[in-house]
């Protein structure tokens, strides 16, 4: 079965075609970074309008690249939440309209499930069960993944997500949008040892996270440097960026390793936008060697929000018998706030 998937939860419009037997056939993505840069963050109304402009051309592109027509599509999938309500409605509306016009089933997918399963798109493919570290601008969670639809929350952030800590710290340093990648680039030129920043909850013994204290520490350093009309010098900024990144990465890696030890597993999947961070990848590769454990990452192109992970998650649900393939009445809802535990397979 060929599934056409749509992602529109925030500021990326993604469309992809996935075959349940052959895997990913084609995917296309448009990011709105340039549009939101002048505002320093995502403007929900602008995001929704841009999704409307992009989704049909991207759909045509994917079908052409895969050598498909709509007659070849057996089901459609879309991100049903969590995310921005207006943005979610664009992808859901297009998917449901297409499903209605072709008498196809429409499968609503949890955005985080898409991220959790995205490393399975790459080779080598991790076998179940595994521990998943989900790190993005909006979420930081450790999950035990026993199979498709079988997820147990092991720990999560109690305040800011890791990606949010990157972005907010970058903003305090006067870096551009999006802040996380800008901070990571600048950190390459810095000396992390110049600033002693806290590692919140590093030794808490549990698997939860907290990054608000780190953000406050960065603010304190910036205020100290800019007191009495001073400014944060370029090298100081690079050093502070390096120290901030090192603190976040150390906490993420330590908690992930603790999760592996507590579960007795030796497979760690890292997903979400922060999973593209080069220091995190290198740090985990070193830290996992003594455990004889393996880390699995999605391709860099699939770390950000994308349609491939949505279509693929739908395909995995179909193969696991967890998707309702009956043609429905195509009434639908989106869920801007949606707990991953609500989609358990039982």
Curated annotation (Swiss-Prot):
Q: For this protein, what does the record note about how its cofactor is bound?
A: Binds 1 Fe(2+) ion per subunit.
Recorded hits in InterPro entries, A to Z, give: ATPase_NBD, Gcp-like_dom, KAE1/TsaD, TsaD
- Keywords, alphabetical: Acyltransferase, Cytoplasm, Iron, Metal-binding, Transferase, tRNA processing
Example of a GO MF term: iron ion binding
Give the Enzyme Commission number.
2.3.1.234
Example GO BP: tRNA threonylcarbamoyladenosine modification
Instruction: Tell me the cofactors it needs.
Output: Fe(2+)
Q: Which residues bind substrate?
A: 134-138, 167, 180, 277
Q: Name one GO cellular component term.
A: cytoplasm
Where is it localised?
Cytoplasm
Main subcellular localization, coarse class?
Answer: cytoplasm
The top EC class, named as a word, is: transferase
Q: Does the keyword tRNA processing apply?
A: yes
Catalytic activity from the UniProt record: L-threonylcarbamoyladenylate + adenosine(37) in tRNA = N(6)-L-threonylcarbamoyladenosine(37) in tRNA + AMP + H(+)
Q: Which residues of the sequence carry a binding annotation for Fe cation?
A: 111, 115, 305
> What's this protein's function?
Required for the formation of a threonylcarbamoyl group on adenosine at position 37 (t(6)A37) in tRNAs that read codons beginning with adenine. Is involved in the transfer of the threonylcarbamoyl moiety of threonylcarbamoyl-AMP (TC-AMP) to the N6 group of A37, together with TsaE and TsaB. TsaD likely plays a direct catalytic role in this reaction.
Annotated family: Belongs to the KAE1 / TsaD family.
Q: Which HAMAP family does UniProt cross-reference here?
A: TsaD
Name used for this protein in its record:
tRNA N6-adenosine threonylcarbamoyltransferase
From the UniProt record, report the name of the gene that encodes this protein.
tsaD
